[in-house]
C-alpha cells in the first residue's frame, strides 16, 4: 500500500496537484513506517512544504528532521535549517557560510546546484539583484549538467 500511495504522491507532485499532494502527504505521514521510509518521506514533505512556503508544516517537519540520528543526519538537518531560514524566514545572514560550503562542495554538481540556489535566494532576500541573477544562472547551469 505504501509504495502505491508513494507513487500516487509523486504523480500529484509532477502534475502540481497541490490539494491531492497535501492529502497524500497527510495520509503517508500518518502511517507507522520503517525508519528509512520515514526519513525519506519527511525530507520529501519538508522540501515540498518549504517550496509552498507553508511555514507551519515546514517547521513541524524541520523539528522532526532535527531528531533524526545516524549517517548524514546532522548535515541534512543543517541544510534543511538553511533552506527554512532562506525560503520561509527570508533571511540573508547565511551568505558567508553558504559561500564556504560551496567552495567545499568541489566537483559535487548536485550539492553545488543546491547551494547556488540558496545563495541566489539569500541575495534576493538581501536585495542584491545582481548577485541573485549571478547565482541563479550558476545554479541553472549545474542543474542542466546534473540532468544531462
What function would you assign to each model-found segment?
Residues 74-90, 96-98:
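Soluble extracytoplasmic domains of inner/organellar membrane proteins
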Residues 18-30, 54-69, 91-106, 128-140:
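Alpha-helical repeat scaffolds
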Residues 1-38, 61:
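N-terminal topogenic membrane-targeting module
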Residues 38-55, 59:
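A membrane-cytosol interface segment of integral membrane proteins
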Residues 117, 121, 126-148:
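Long, hydrophobic alpha-helical segments that serve as membrane-spanning/inserting helices
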Residues 11-14, 47-48, 84-88, 122:
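Residue-level signature for tetratricopeptide repeat
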